[in-house]
Amino acid sequence: GAMAAGLLVLAACGSSSKSTSSTAAATTTAPTATTTASTSAATTAASTAPTTGSSTAPTTGSSTAPTTGSSTAPTTGSSTTGTGGGKATAGELKDICPAEIKIQTDWVPEAEHGFLYQMIGKGYTVNNNDASVTGPLTASGGVDTGVKLTVLSGGSAKGFSSDTTLMYADPTILLGFVYTDEAIQNSAKFPTVAIESGYNKNPQMIMWDPATYPNVKGIADLGQAKVKVRYFGGAAYMDFFTSTGVLSKDQVDGSYKGDPSQFVADEGKSAQQGFGSAEPYQYEKIIKNWLKPVTFQYINDVGWKNYAESIATIPANITKYSACFKKLVPIIQQSTIDYTKSPAAANAVILAAVAGFGNNFGWTYDQGAADYAAATIAKDKLVDNGPDGVLGKFDIARVTDLITKAIPVYTAQDSPPKAGLKASDIVTNEFIDPSIGL
């Protein structure tokens, strides 16, 4: 039912689209989705996401969409102006950016995307055909920048295609979430450049039942105890763990698709991939046959230091839209700070979007899940300053370290990264405002 599907998605969060489909982006088939896709966002959704069944989409109809949210969206972000810079002026993106900036996320709306929904101002509309939310792109303090922002859902709404695939298929999508390891993997055939780091710490984790394994304190202990670990097949971090001896190949199971039923059926005997900002709440509060705590360790804490949900684009756009990015990136930096400090307004937009989508994408999400995610993002410093106290800035040495670790992993997977790949090929700090930090 919808509930299982909803949890399904939570489990996956960024992970399914990132890890399973990033490989899809590396195959030559990905860009062929292009032809019709660029005509409109709706066609993209239809062409890439047969699974969601466009037949159900129109039933809820856009008639209900505009009402959702226009009333509930408070002046996003006016409660805190944050610190440092980020003071935008009215209309400042008009004429230098596309009239509608489309940003592709990697899942259906959830609090992990809050820093984007934070920029959607009053009078937004929810489109339940293509799972998007459109409103005036509003900077910190309620400043209307003069362009529209459309936040596009991913995951089940886009047939689980990776954002890299979707950006190459539809050039009207200016920006999308790309994890650093995915950028490394696709650097030879489908390169992307990230212009803002997103999550300084990837929310992905491995979780286990503390009642079954009271002595397990981390992922390496799961390896020692030979516990079965379910994950999304193709995830590079897992190949890193098995090739470096953290886990062994015979204990990992790549069949996981986000459904909680196997974890529940195993009664705590197996471990599983998830998001630290999502599953612990779901399993303790919502999954009826579980309803007890789980314990977890973040993947970043075991050496695979990935940035998550970085804001990235196709390389040609770096020059083409440099004037736009120079103004837009500081707005994203400040929006991230505003959301982290005061998530209520953007969470209201997220919940309105989920309600507006109805059952079209098999996603359920509630206030408790949104509140838990926002609190965890702050508490566990998933959003945090980068080098020099600057939010959104990439640590080039850290990216270089991940490239070094990832090259043998992806080469073994038959999707070798670009020869001689450097951090500057996949990330840039050129548009970052150094005065903006938490």
Which residues make up each language-model segment?
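Bacterial signal peptide processing site
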Residues: 13-17
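Secondary-structure end/capping motifs
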Residues: 321-413
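Conserved C-terminal helix/tail region of periplasmic/extracytoplasmic solute-binding proteins
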Residues: 78, 87, 396-438
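Short, glycine-/small- and polar/acidic-enriched structural segments
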Residues: 84-256, 263, 270-273
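Extracellular mucin-like PTS domains
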Residues: 19-84
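Short, solvent-exposed loop/beta-turn-alpha elements that line the ligand-binding surface or hinge
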Residues: 125-144, 296-304, 319, 381-394
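Pocket-lining segment of extracytoplasmic ligand-binding domains
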Residues: 181, 257-360
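C-terminal motif of bacterial Sec signal peptides marking the signal peptidase cleavage site
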Residues: 8-12
